Design a protein with these regions (language model features):
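C-terminal helix-rich "cap/oligomerization" subdomain common to oxidoreductases
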Residues: 1, 30, 70-73, 268-308
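Beta-loop-alpha module in the N-terminal Rossmann-like domain of NAD(P)-dependent dehydrogenases
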Residues: 20, 50-97, 101-113
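N-terminal Rossmann-like dinucleotide-binding module
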Residues: 1-50
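Short, charged/polar "capping" segments at the starts of alpha-helices
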Residues: 40-46, 105-108, 134, 220
Length: 308
């Protein structure tokens, strides 16, 4: 591999993996990109003949004996730990981006932590969640005892919970919180072999609460926030944009962090030593904690629950 060009590996080329890939593929910078998927023939057929500035390689199994500046794992959650373990055993990786939901077994979190300790060359582990990023973009500062509601659009309830917990965690400044439920039931996810829920959830801390409401009629998510001074409404991913209203007046519009646009820029910024330390690149520790909180909650409600 050319040492002057960043080497990227993407494992799992479903919708999210493809979005990550296209972020690099559409860049004006040149990259060495390895793509790995069980259905790699279809992907290879689509991209091999297209003219581009990148070096592309296609693999059905995880490649070995390579040095990667970045590896993105966008497989299903059930197989993610096994794939990461094999990847790090046979390759040198500087940075990892992991899709959510991280792992579906509590033991895999502790096992992965052991791997991290024996793999000191990993400088960044990022989990692709957008709650923290979006809230920081808004610049919202709330007084204590706020009340919030999160209205889901026609997207999955459980599958978006990690994003919402990430957002709430930022609102309450990393304080601990409870996940409470009201008449929730398990239903089948649109993704085969995984679960979803219907009902209502609430996140509760000492200084605020957030009610999560399934509103399938809406085409986008809506966050409503109230404290003693102001009210805020945030439309999320409304035609790839976020619109923030303060006391019913539009005050800010910014891009929703779509992987197709965001990933390559995110990686480039993470390498820049001058970028503010407040930018949440290495968020694995926090998202791992939130993921386990969510997983334990569902395990307490249902005999078996598999998150995607």
């Amino acid at each position: 591999m050319n040492s002057n060009i960043k080497n990227i590996l993407i494992i799992g080329i479903g919708p999210m993996g493809l979005s990550h890939f296209e972020s690099f593929y559409n860049s004006q910078k040149s990259y060495n990109i390895d793509l790995c998927d069980l259905s790699i023939k279809k992907i290879k057929k689509k991209y091999k003949k297209q003219k581009n500035i990148h070096r592309l390689k296609f693999f059905k199994t995880i490649p070995k004996n390579n040095n990667y500046d970045l590896a993105i794992i966008s497989t299903n959650s059930k197989e993610r730990y096994r794939i990461i373990k094999k990847l790090l055993k046979f390759n040198k990786v500087a940075n990892l981006i992991l899709e959510k939901f991280l792992f579906n077994r509590i033991k895999e979190y502790s096992d992965f932590q052991k791997i991290i300790k024996t793999y000191p060359k990993l400088r960044m582990i990022n989990v692709n969640t957008w709650g923290n990023h979006i809230l920081k973009k808004t610049g919202i500062r709330l007084t204590q005892n706020f009340i919030a509601s999160y209205h889901l659009g026609n997207k999955g309830f459980a599958t978006n919970l990690i994003h919402i917990c990430d957002l709430f965690n930022e609102l309450i400044k990393n304080e601990d919180f409870e996940i409470l439920s009201n008449n929730i039931s398990k239903i089948k996810s649109k993704r085969f072999g995984y679960d979803e829920i219907s009902g209502r959830l609430m996140l509760k801390s000492s200084n605020g609460v957030l009610k999560i409401i399934d509103n399938s009629k809406s085409k986008y998510h809506i966050l409503r926030l109230y404290d003693k001074k102001n009210s805020y409404t945030l439309q999320l991913n409304n035609k790839k944009k976020c619109h923030l209203f303060k006391n019913k007046k539009l005050i800010k519009t910014f891009d929703f962090p779509m992987a197709r646009i965001f990933t390559e820029n995110f990686f480039t910024r993470s390498l820049n030593k001058n970028v503010s330390k407040n930018y949440n690149f290495d968020n694995y520790k926090k998202i791992s904690y939130l993921s386990q909180k969510i997983l334990l909650f569902f395990k307490s409600k249902f005999k078996r629950f598999d998150l995607t």
